[in-house]
Each structure stands twice: as C-alpha cells, then as structure tokens.
From Swiss-Prot:
Intrachain S-S bonds: none
Enzyme class: transferase
Keyword field contains Transcription regulation: no
Membership in a protein family: Belongs to the MnmG family. TrmFO subfamily.
Name the record gives this protein: Methylenetetrahydrofolate--tRNA-(uracil-5-)-methyltransferase TrmFO
Subcellular location: Cytoplasm
Species of provenance: Cereibacter sphaeroides (strain ATCC 17025 / ATH 2.4.3)
Xref: Pfam families: GIDA
InterPro entries for the chain: FAD/NAD-bd_sf, MnmG-rel, MnmG-rel_CS, MnmG_N, TrmFO
Major site of localization recorded for this protein: cytoplasm
C-alpha cells in the first residue's frame, strides 16, 4: 500500500501540492487549521483564499515572467490556474479572479478527490516521521513557527520583513554610478567592486529628504505589529528622526571615491548590493520602506543613476514568516536536517499567489515521486519554476535572503549575440527558451 503524504496548510501552495500528489496516485492527508483556528487576514475556512489582491498579475506568457509561470502551471495541469481561469474577471492583460467562487471551487475539487482526506486541525510542531509538506504561509501559527525555529535554529525564521527595493542592473546608469565596496574592502576584485554607488550633492540630498517626508505611506495592518524593529526601520522613519540621519546611516558617503569624478566629494551616497549570483539584480541597501508603490518609484528615481531604474520588486515592511531557504533546504525543497519534511509556498521565501502555488506544485510532485520510488529533479533554471526554486535553494545570497517574486533577473542571461536585443524581443527569447525546457522536463 502506498504511504500517505501529509500536507499542512491549504493555501495556494498546499492546495496545489495536494492536487499534484493525488493526481500522481499518492494518498494525501491535508491538514488545515481554519476555520477552527483563524488568522487576522482570513475571512473564511475555504482553501486557497485570496486574502489581499484578487489578481494573479500579468497573463502574458510571451513577454512577462509571471505570465510564463502561468503557462508552466497550466502545462503541468495545475489546479490553481485551472480554477483561476474558470473564475476569471475582465482585467485587461492581467488574470483577475472572482475570489470567493475561486476558493469555493478549489475547496470542492480537493474535498471531492478520492485520494485526498482533509483534517481540520492545527499542527503545533514539526513531525519527526512520515512524509510531510509544510505550506503554512506567512501567517504560520505561533506554536508551529516556534517548533520550526527550535529545529532549524533561532536565526532561521524571520517574523518581520524588511524588504528593500530591487533594481534590474541593466537599468542603472553606470555613467553616473560606479562599482566599489566601502574602503575597497575585499580580497578579490569581485568583493572590492561588490556595490554600485550613486552619489548625491547637498541639494539633491535635501530634495530627496523632502520627497521622502512628503510621500504617501501605508500603515501596518491590524495584527501585524504596533511598531518597528530598530534593525529594519523604514527610511522615511529614519528621515523623520532628523534630516541628517540617513546621511550618517545607509547613505553615508565615507570610504568611497567617485570613479568618474575622483575630486568630487559626495554629500551622500546610495549603495546597491548584488541580490543574485547572476548579477542581474541589485537591492538598494537599507531602503526598506512603507511608502506606497507609486511614491516609491518617483522618489527612488530621484537618485542619480536611477532616473530610469526598472524595479524587479518594490520595498515594504510587514509581518512574514519565512525560512532562510538557501541555508536550510536542498534542491528538492527538503529540510536538510529532516529530509522527510518539505516546505512549499510563501514560507520558503517566494512572494505572491502564483509563485506560492508554483512551489507547491513542485513540492507535491517531488514528494509524490519520492514516495513512489522515483527521483524528480527540479526544472531547469531556464524555466520560471526552475529559476524560482534555484533562487530560493541556493541562487540567492543567504545573508540577505528576502522574499522574491518571479522575474527575468532570476533567469540565466540570454545569449545576445548578433546585436543588442530590444527589451520585448529579449523577453520573448526568455519565454521561448523556457517553454522548450519546461516541455522537455515534463516529458521526462
């Protein structure tokens, strides 16, 4: 008799994982604490409840990374994408969903599946035996979170996001910015040039502070937190403490020499640090923020060298429970310390409904394959799913790991021989390559 797979959490990731494993012939026990134990964000006990936006973002699978992820999930017969398409709302090129019928249909399909049984209970600690997928999301219960912390180490779980904006490297004006680590620290050339620096004059700095203070901000949601941790203060809060605070904090100019104008002394410097091994993404150091998204783009484009910046992710601070996955998970999403346990979804450090469901899809398939005596490798990094799982299980820098949406900066660069591609053509090249690779992976 085939042994059962236990899945904890029936959000996007857990629901998709359960569906995939059951469709492969593996019995699934799906554990969900709602509605018996609620959270401040959920309204119902339905599976895959959309607690924030009702959008799955762009459905363009030719020129958009999340649209490509939609395509891959459809190709893999994903339940979440099937139900999203069935309850689609008019939204231009985006995939918007009628959230309540969507959740109801996901719940019905899972409860009706002959190989899926649902247990309405809270799991309070990590199990020591059996096959498990933990897909409890950013609102993991405090008891389970404490158990995860105890097993993996005190620093392995973050309960509060300090998310800095991430910029595509190709959109940074390097005729203004330059590469240098503070005081030229580092033993190798890569280390000595690990940061991109954007200089500001006094007037530019003062205008930037004015814009920060005037920008629209979002407030913490009830149940998140009543205040800030000093280690991840929003830049606008630092500015409120004094106009010079940032210049003596993340924007301090010391130890840096402008490679373009060595005689000029910057009044302040904004630093960007590489965010992935490919060097295609850079985060703005110390720039966690609660500014609204529209305000962020206008304020951050005031920074010299970032006037035409393209953002892979904007900043934010909010409660989030997620693992330091590059340190703790192997490439099959197994916990290295307890390989019988996999993690999936937002708790692994991906951001967004679709990304969470995609990691659930992979975890469900990988766990089912293992139970059936087979090994299923992750998709190639040229695919959207492969790029995401590669990022969270080793491609990201462990010391600065933060939740990430899918974006083309996670993919291995496209060979641009024959001239520089236009952006749209380059994106099409990414998606065409990904579709071929994903189709081959599915067939294998």
């Amino acid at each position: 008799m085939t042994r059962s797979l236990h899945i904890v959490g029936a959000g996007m990731a857990g629901s998709e994982a359960a569906w995939q494993a059951a469709e492969m012939g593996v019995p699934v026990v799906l554990h969900e604490m709602r509605p018996r134990v609620g959270t401040f964000a959920h309204r119902t006990g339905q599976f895959a409840e959309m607690v924030c936006s009702n959008s799955f973002r762009s459905d363009d699978d030719e020129r958009n990374a999340v649209g490509l992820l939609h395509w891959e999930m459809r190709a893999a017969r994903g339940l979440i994408m099937e139900m999203a398409s069935a309850h689609r709302l008019p939204a231009g090129g985006a995939l918007a969903v009628d959230r309540d019928p969507f959740a109801e249909s996901v719940t019905a399909r899972l409860r009706e599946h002959p190989l899926i049984s649902v247990v309405d209970e809270e799991l309070a600690e990590l199990p020591s035996d059996g096959d498990w997928i933990i897909a409890t999301g950013p609102l993991t219960s405090s008891s389970l979170a404490e158990s995860i912390r105890a097993v993996t180490g005190a620093q392995s779980l973050a309960f509060f996001d300090a998310i800095a904006p991430i910029v595509y490297a190709e959109s940074i004006d390097m005729s203004v910015a330059w590469r240098q680590s503070r005081y030229d620290k580092g033993e190798t050339e890569d280390e000595r040039t690990a940061y991109i620096n954007c200089p500001m004059t006094r007037d530019q700095y003062e205008a930037f502070i004015d814009a920060l203070l005037a920008a629209e901000k979002t407030e913490f949601h009830e149940g998140e937190t009543a205040g800030y941790f000093d280690g991840c203060l929003p830049i606008e809060v630092m500015a409120e403490r004094g106009r010079e605070t940032l210049r003596h904090g993340p924007m301090k100019p010391v130890g840096l020499t402008n490679a373009h104008k060595p005689q000029d002394k910057a009044h302040a410097v904004v630093q960007l640090r590489r965010d992935n091994k490919l060097g295609t993404l850079y985060n703005i150091v110390g720039f966690q923020t609660k500014m609204k998204y529209g305000a962020q783009t206008s304020v951050f484009r005031m920074i010299p060298g970032l006037e035409n910046a393209s953002f892979a992710r904007l900043g934010g601070i909010h409660r989030n429970t997620f693992l330091n996955s590059p340190t703790l998970l192997d490439d099959r999403m197994r916990l290295k310390l307890r390989p019988n346990i996999r993690f999936a979804g937002q708790v692994t450090g991906v951001e967004g409904y679709v990304e969470s469901a995609a990691m659930g899809l992979l975890a469900g398939r990988m766990a089912a394959a293992e139970i059936l005596g087979r090994d299923l490798p992750p998709p190639p990094p040229e695919t959207a799913m492969g790029a995401l799982i590669t990022h969270i299980t080793g491609g990201a820098e462990a010391k600065t790991f933060q939740p990430m949406n899918v974006n083309f900066g996670l993919f291995p660069p496209i060979d641009a021989r024959g001239g520089r591609r236009g952006r749209k053509d380059r994106y099409k090249a990414y998606t065409h390559r990904a579709k071929a690779a994903f189709t081959e992976w599915l067939a294998a």
